[in-house]
Amino acid sequence: MAVIKIDTSQYDAQLSEKEQRIAAQFQRFGVDKLEVFSSEPINYRQRAEFRVWHDGDDLFHIMFDQQTKDKIRVDSFDPAAPLVGEVMQVMIDNLKSCEILRRKLFQIDYLSTLSGEILVSLLYHKPLDEHWLSEINTLKEKLSSKYKIDFIGRARKQKEMLGDDYVTERLNVNGQELIYQQVENSFTQPNAKVNIKMLEWAQDLCKPLKNDLLELYCGNGNFSIALAGSFNKVLATEISKSSVHSAQYNIAQNKVDNLDIIRMSSEEFTQAMNGERSFSRLEGIDLNSYNCQTILVDPPRAGMDTLTCDLVANYESIIYISCNPETLERDLDHLTRTHEVKRFAIFDQFPYTHHIESGVFLQKKNT
């Protein structure tokens, strides 16, 4: 069932259930104690996506029940950050009265930040012409008196930008402000306050670690930028072109001078490290100049393939960030042949759902 209305009195119970479930699932890896990081019980999501339903003169957001596929009208959305919730209502009020903006509109996406920016993407089953551009400009001017708001219009083979296609998040991590560009249609952690807790936990892990860090699946540099100060050098890989572009932007904004990002998949990087293939994308980067004793991986829900697990197992210390306990368990079966779990944390990125974000710290066994 989609989470729309929230009874905050149930928050502690649902988190306790997750803690017990994960503790039981990973007990065989010697996990004695979980570190548990809670979320805000309401208004925690910085992004939200809705379909749009037209009913005569009426117009409203909808979601679909995951089991029955029935549509659910969404006039207010309790998980949404306050800025998203407020702008949702403002958008509906303004779209209802504008035929040009509402016609053939089928989806609205919201992306916001703790620092007060919001990007609204409007998706259409029609080409966007000069009349649409005129109306959306008028709306942007009207709303900009109160909000730091930009718009994107999307139609088939068409993208119109009214402002930027990204927001700039500013996170206070252990007293340091970190700046992150977050681009429309690119992955970012939806629960910004829990993301801060994840970054602070990772920084704590890295305090005693030395030499260099390798990160696979680095996204927009979320972890590597926060951890760069703990290491001599950081090398990070990411396959998404837009995420690599954002990571480079974020490196410059945060004045990080010891971090290199290369655009390649974990499988390709494994081939490069094993000397199986050479890549022009590695030109100017001497892999042998890095003394990486720590590796951080934050893979997609599918986890890591066997060859990547083999590569990861070569490092003294492993930080594994996971959004899927099932593939994490599978990969730990592989990694605990050579390493032992030292710390295990859960982060409630997605309250009131079965989803859970985990962080595991492993160190090589003494032989």
From Swiss-Prot:
Keywords: Methyltransferase, S-adenosyl-L-methionine, Transferase, tRNA processing. S-adenosyl-L-methionine binds at Q189, Y217, N222, E238, D298. InterPro entries: MeTrfase_TrmA_AS (IPR030390), MeTrfase_TrmA_CS (IPR030391), SAM-dependent_MTases_sf (IPR029063), TrmA_MeTrfase (IPR011869), U5_MeTrfase_fam (IPR010280). Pfam families: tRNA_U5-meth_tr (PF05958). It comes from the Bacteria. It is an enzyme of class 2 (transferase). GO terms for cellular component: cytosol. One of its GO terms (molecular function) is tRNA binding. Its EC number is 2.1.1.-, 2.1.1.35. One of its GO terms (biological process) is tRNA methylation. The active site is at C323 (nucleophile), E357 (proton acceptor). It catalyses: uridine(54) in tRNA + S-adenosyl-L-methionine = 5-methyluridine(54) in tRNA + S-adenosyl-L-homocysteine + H(+); uridine(341) in tmRNA + S-adenosyl-L-methionine = 5-methyluridine(341) in tmRNA + S-adenosyl-L-homocysteine + H(+). Gene3D superfamilies: 2.40.50.1070, Vaccinia Virus protein VP39. PANTHER family: TRNA/TMRNA (URACIL-C(5))-METHYLTRANSFERASE, TRNA_TMRNA (URACIL-C(5))-METHYLTRANSFERASE. Belongs to the class I-like SAM-binding methyltransferase superfamily. RNA M5U methyltransferase family. TrmA subfamily. Dual-specificity methyltransferase that catalyzes the formation of 5-methyluridine at position 54 (m5U54) in all tRNAs, and that of position 341 (m5U341) in tmRNA (transfer-mRNA). This is tRNA/tmRNA (uracil-C(5))-methyltransferase.
